[in-house]
Design a protein with these regions (language model features):
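Bacterial N-terminal signal peptides that target proteins for export
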Residues: 1-6
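Bacterial signal peptide processing site
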Residues: 18-20
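A structural signal for well-ordered alpha-helices, especially hydrophobic packing surfaces
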Residues: 34, 57, 61-64, 83, ...
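Post-signal-peptide N-terminal segment of Sec-exported extracytoplasmic proteins
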Residues: 25, 35-78, 119
Length: 122
């Protein structure tokens, strides 16, 4: 019973969103998310996700022009999600690079210690 009520409420919320024109702040938030992704290097580190975010935001604008507010609303949301994914993938790639660099530095130091002090540093 409560599950049916939850489903009906969800459908009602979705139906309400479908007829409501997205606020300009929704577009601003999506744009800011794209800029944030660019700042963390998504152009290089997560280009596909960043491209999807840009395309979906552009499509949302077209949806607004043709008064397809429900489509525009969902495309704005998808744009933000793709931007967030681009941010996280970029951060992950950056962290992996740092770990790799530090591992290599540790290996070099270990080799130098072994060369200078022998097997006691293994």
């Amino acid at each position: 019973m409560s599950r049916n009520i939850a489903v009906l409420l969800s459908v009602g919320v979705l139906a309400g969103c479908a007829t409501t024109k997205p606020e300009p702040s929704a577009f601003e938030a999506a744009e800011e998310a794209i800029v944030a992704a660019e700042r963390v290097g998504a152009e290089e580190l997560a280009p596909v996700e960043l491209r999807f975010a840009r395309e979906k935001l552009a499509n949302a604008r077209r949806g607004m022009e043709s008064k397809q507010f429900d489509i525009a609303y969902w495309l704005i949301e998808e744009s933000e999600i793709n931007s967030e994914l681009a941010i996280e993938k970029s951060r992950t790639a950056t962290a992996r690079r740092k770990v790799s660099e530090l591992s290599r530095t540790n290996e070099i130091l270990r080799e130098e210690l072994e060369a200078n002090y022998g097997e006691q540093f293994k």
